Amino acid sequence: MSIETFTPTPLLFTPGAANKVKTLIDEEGNPRLKLRVFVTGGGCSGFQYGFTFDEDIADDDTVIERDGVGLVVDPMSFQYLAGSEVDYQEGLEGSRFVIKNPNAATTCGCGQSFSI
């Protein structure tokens, strides 16, 4: 009998995203906050990304630290986000956190929903 070990591909939390999270946390004045990214059903492609700030971290959450700030992902969302890049972009369409997900077969035009 052989046992295989599964090591999920981590998320990349870019310096730009971490810097924006730090700025927003400083504005809130609550150093316990972390950016939580999650996946829910919905959107025009089947799944959609969500972002919120959270103080509470569950035992089974994944926490990725960069430059003194944290990105938190629950286990259900992590399976859809493994190998993704979480970034922050500013442009003509506005400023927002974006996810570049190699697991997504299709994405909608706004980049907020996807299908596998």
Swiss-Prot record:
Organism taxonomic ancestry: Bacteria, Pseudomonadati, Pseudomonadota, Gammaproteobacteria, Pseudomonadales
Keyword Membrane listed: no
NCBIfam families per the UniProt record, alphabetical: iron-sulfur cluster assembly accessory protein, PRK13623.1
Physiological role: Required for insertion of 4Fe-4S clusters for at least IspG.
Protein name (Swiss-Prot/TrEMBL): Iron-sulfur cluster insertion protein ErpA
Xref: InterPro entries: FeS_biogenesis, FeS_cluster_insertion, FeS_cluster_insertion_CS, FeS_cluster_insertion_RrpA, HesB-like_dom_sf
Gene: erpA
Gene3D superfamilies named among the record's database cross-references: HesB-like domain
A molecular-function term among this protein's GO annotations: 2 iron, 2 sulfur cluster binding
